[in-house]
Amino acid sequence: ARARSVAQGKPVVLAAYQSVYSKASAEESEQANKLTMATLFSHGATQLLAGEGGNVLVDPYYVNNHKAADSTVEMLKRWYDFLVEHDEILMDPRIAEVTDSFAGPLNEDVEVAYDNLCVTEDPKEGAVWRRVTTTPHGLVVHLINLVGQKDTLWDGPKRSGILVEGGRLTLRCCAGRTPRVFVADPDGSGHLEELRVHCEGAQAKVDLPPLQVWQVLRVIL
């Protein structure tokens, strides 16, 4: 947010080189990279990573790059395609963080819950990290899966994500008006897909699909 405030409309690109690729297995490195990208993309930023010839940057000295596994190249293509497709709800400079205004114990306009799991406003190992932003195209809820991780170090090896099921989104809405909710997942179809909404008075409830690494929920109240 600070970088965007001084960027004067320029893209925010972090020199967040993933040195983990040169130190850990492709699987552990890809998981770390996914969590890094989920964090950056959901905040409207990207990183310096993809090099030439299927290599990834692991060091500020670009000669020290790493030949990416085929699975890494496919993953990066999938995630970059996702970023481009959903640019309007991820990268628009008018997007603002509103988590504290919409979620939490004092403001329950947007709530996400899972059985026997913590949902947090800050990244914490073992939890689902929830953020809410306002965009020109409605509210967006970001869910990032840190369940099963031992730490939140962005450039350290990460275990394969534990699939988190049983999530429910609850919205406070105007009686007689049904909100629309869409979900997208870079490790799923990659496209926004509409979810079924069930209204109970001033509340609308939505059963969420299983959470892999990152889900983007677009909410039109």
Language model feature labels by segment:
Residues 24, 50, 151-153, 179-181, ...:
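Short acidic, gly/pro-rich beta-turn/loop elements at beta-sheet edges
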Residues 1-114, 120-121, 132-133, 192, ...:
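Glycan-processing catalytic domains of CAZymes
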Residues 200-221:
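C-terminal beta-strand-rich structural cap/linker in extracellular carbohydrate-active enzymes
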Residues 38, 112-175, 215:
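Carbohydrate-binding surface patches
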Residues 17, 144-146, 172-174, 209, ...:
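Structured loops at beta-to-helix junctions and adjacent beta-edge loops in soluble globular domains
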Residues 180-204:
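Solvent-exposed beta-strand/loop surfaces of large extracellular or lumenal domains
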